Amino acid sequence: MRAVVQRVISSKVEVDGKVIGSIGKGLNVLLGISKEDTEEDIKYLKEKIINLRIFEDENEKLNKSLLDIGGDIIIVSQFTLYGDCRKGRRPSFIEALGGEEAYILYNKFVESIKKEVNNVATGEFGADMKVYIENDGPVTILLDSKKTF
């Protein structure tokens, strides 16, 4: 399971011109799910994301987590995080989990976050979305539950 985690001032997702999810200060998470992912990957990434100390304290040091600041989170599914561009010019998505299986793991991830964070918004799984991100910093962190980077 992979995530691109961005510290944001605000973020929103539109589908067919309608806002379906929006947040204020917090994290925008683009989430990719692989064929190898399990509930253990969900647990690892959830704990890592909600406890990442990427918000500034009173001394402007990155010492506070999403939980510490009571921030919001928006989670957007993005299978392209498993795009393999090592061969040729067209990404291969063979490692990305698709369809119903990915939808189930995505929802389990979202539900695990909802148990910890008050304001959780999402995109629409499988939809063509417009994602608006007002970065703060910018601070962008790449996470992989298999620890490949």
UniProtKB/Swiss-Prot annotation:
Major enzyme class: hydrolase
Keywords: Cytoplasm, Hydrolase, RNA-binding, tRNA-binding
Compartment(s) of residence: Cytoplasm
Annotated GO MF terms: D-tyrosyl-tRNA(Tyr) deacylase activity; Gly-tRNA(Ala) deacylase activity; Ser(Gly)-tRNA(Ala) hydrolase activity; tRNA binding
Entry GO terms, CC: cytoplasm
Recorded superkingdom: Bacteria
Example of a GO biological process term: D-amino acid catabolic process
EC number: 3.1.1.96
Main location: cytoplasm
Pfam families, per database record: Tyr_Deacylase
Summary of the function given for this chain in its UniProt record: An aminoacyl-tRNA editing enzyme that deacylates mischarged D-aminoacyl-tRNAs. Also deacylates mischarged glycyl-tRNA(Ala), protecting cells against glycine mischarging by AlaRS. Acts via tRNA-based rather than protein-based catalysis; rejects L-amino acids rather than detecting D-amino acids in the active site. By recycling D-aminoacyl-tRNA to D-amino acids and free tRNA molecules, this enzyme counteracts the toxicity associated with the formation of D-aminoacyl-tRNA entities in vivo and helps enforce protein L-homochirality.
Quaternary structure annotation from Swiss-Prot or TrEMBL: Homodimer.
Family per record: Belongs to the DTD family.
Record's comment describing the protein's domains: A Gly-cisPro motif from one monomer fits into the active site of the other monomer to allow specific chiral rejection of L-amino acids.
HAMAP family: Deacylase_Dtd (MF_00518)
NCBIfam families: D-aminoacyl-tRNA deacylase
Protein name: D-aminoacyl-tRNA deacylase
Organism per entry: Clostridium botulinum (strain Langeland / NCTC 10281 / Type F)
